[in-house]
Structure formats: structure tokens, C-alpha cells
UniProtKB/Swiss-Prot annotation:
Signal peptide: none annotated. It comes from the Bacteria. InterPro entries: Bact_PeptidoProc_Enz (IPR052179), Hedgehog_sig/DD-Pept_Zn-bd_sf (IPR009045), Pept_M15B (IPR003709). One of its GO terms (molecular function) is peptidase activity. It holds the Pfam family VanY. GO terms for biological process: proteolysis. This is Uncharacterized protein HI_0100. It comes from Haemophilus influenzae (strain ATCC 51907 / DSM 11121 / KW20 / Rd).
């Protein structure tokens, strides 16, 4: 796999599919007529959800939750997601069990476009995109 591209999500590879993840925002904080964009700037200083972001960062650890897409390892090609919350006790267990061998099994019987290409690059995809 070469070139620059954005990998949004591979079927069955999203942490949301584990049932341990949730995206959070407060619709009451959006300006009238503004739709949610789920962009990091919305959660940064000057953004609609900055105070929510500060509250989450301070309080989530007290309840075994974390923001897994905030301080990414330099080898990962995944964007920051300050809205993405993970329940650590279950997410860590799922993460330990999730491997490149699991995805092709999950895809059996499904019509996944590009599956052969994805399968041939699963090791690289896992090392660069799976958190």
C-alpha cells in the first residue's frame, strides 16, 4: 500500500463495534443552525465543546473511561478524536483479542469490496491505523 489516503473505517474494525466506545457531544452547545462536524477544533480552545472537553479530560479517568484518540503514537495514521470515549476495562480486553486474523473471519459470507486488497495489507493496516 502506498500513497496518501484517509482510512475512515474498515468494516468490523471500528472500536465502536466492540460495544466499548461512544462519541459524545452536547447539542445544546452548538450555535443555532450549526450542525455537528466532529472535528477536533470543535473541542479545542475557542470551539463549541471546549468546556465539555476539559470536563471529560478531568473526570473520565475517575470512572474507568479514556480518550484513546487524543495522544496518538507517532507511528499511527489516525486523527485526533476528542469526542471518542472508551470504557477501558472492556476496551483493553477487546484490544488484546483483536488481531489481523480476526477481520477475515468476520467478513466470511459478506460482500466486502476490496477485501482481497485489505487482507493482503492487514499487518500494515493494524500497525498504522488500528488503535
Amino acid at each position: 500500500m502506498s500513497g496518501d489516503f484517509t482510512l475512515v473505517c474498515i468494516t468490523a474494525a471500528s472500536r465502536h463495534h466492540w460495544g466499548t466506545e461512544v462519541d459524545i457531544f452536547d447539542p445544546d452547545l452548538l450555535p443555532r443552525g450549526q450542525s455537528l462536524q466532529l472535528e477536533p477544533w470543535e473541542y479545542e480552545k475557542g470551539g463549541y465543546f471546549f468546556e465539555l472537553s476539559e470536563f471529560l479530560a478531568e473526570n473520565l479517568p475517575h470512572f474507568d473511561f479514556a480518550l484513546p484518540f487524543m495522544n496518538m503514537q507517532s507511528n499511527k495514521k489516525v486523527g485526533r478524536e476528542p469526542w471518542h470515549i472508551s470504557y477501558l476495562p472492556l476496551a483493553e480486553l477487546a484490544s488484546q483479542q483483536f488481531s489481523p486474523e480476526i477481520l477475515p473471519q468476520a467478513w466470511k459470507g459478506e460482500n466486502i469490496l476490496g477485501a482481497d486488497c485489505l487482507i493482503s495489507h492487514l499487518e500494515q493496516i493494524f500497525s498504522e491505523y488500528i488503535v
